[in-house]
Amino acid sequence: MKTILVLNDHSTTASHAAIFALDLAQKIRANIIVASIMLSDDVIRHEDLKLGETGSLLIHRSELLKTLFAQKKRYADFRPVIQEIELTDFTGDELHQLTNDRNIYLVVRGMDEFLPSALISINLSISMLLSNIKCPLLVVPSSWNFKAFRELVYLTDLRFCGINTVSYIADLAGEWNARVIIAHSTASGLPEIEEKDAEDIFKNEVHNHINYKNLSMRMVDKAMVPDVIKLVVHSFHADLLVFVNQHFHFNTFTKQYFKDKCALYEPVPMLIFPY
């Protein structure tokens, strides 16, 4: 059984992301752990969720948990099991151990993309989170309206396209029969590759190893690189952007994501792999 971990800092963005995570969990038949930072003393110890001798994870009765329990009554068939625990913060050893011990499939975090400090805040937060987890991080923007995924776009240089990453994306996309597009954008400092060579790499190194029919490749014109996020959202119709936390692409893309306070396009969720 897959498990989705939702990070709860008690903000409206966290609640927004958690409700989406619940719908996602129902779709893929996963359970949910809500990891909350809490000051309340109204907690119950749950021995099955112990981190170790230094202390136990704790179950809470937060407003978010009450909301999720109410929301899941909508489902006619599968209803995710929801647990809530306490972490000291989202950057320490507790998070690392939790994602490993519970074999977490996905970590979900909300964000307010319109804050003036959004770029600095999200980059710092993502950097710290990705250094402590071994599974993908799904970042859900506050302005995004829930809908089924139809186009999942993985921005990468084909020469660094990870099979495990594509396999994960294809598995997720299959729940909606969505398209997976590998958008090739040459990494800074590397020579451009011809479209035919890119197609050969895609066919031999990617497509032939992934059992998913709705998988394709598109080239990103070099002239469009400064606005590649706008391109893939508008022209490729991406409703989920996929990145790998690699310096030659990730920083460039996240800077574009927050360009002009996201006024250039409708912000969509980001699925970020830690390696």
What feature does the model see in each segment?
Residues 1-52, 151-218, 238, 265, ...:
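Small/aliphatic-rich secondary-structure junction motif
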Residues 121-125, 197-201, 254-261:
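Charged helix-capping and loop-helix junction motifs
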Residues 52-64:
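A short acidic, glycine-rich active-site loop
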Residues 1-16, 105, 111-112, 117-118, ...:
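Intrinsically disordered or low-complexity boundary/linker segments at protein termini
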Residues 44, 112-114, 246-248:
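Short glycine-rich anion-binding loops that position phosphate/pyrophosphate groups of nucleotides
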Residues 36, 111, 184, 244-246, ...:
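Short secondary-structure boundary segments
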Residues 41-42, 92, 116, 147, ...:
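Generic structural signal for helix capping and beta-alpha/helix-loop junctions
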Residues 73-107, 210-241, 246-258, 268, ...:
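Structural beta-alpha unit
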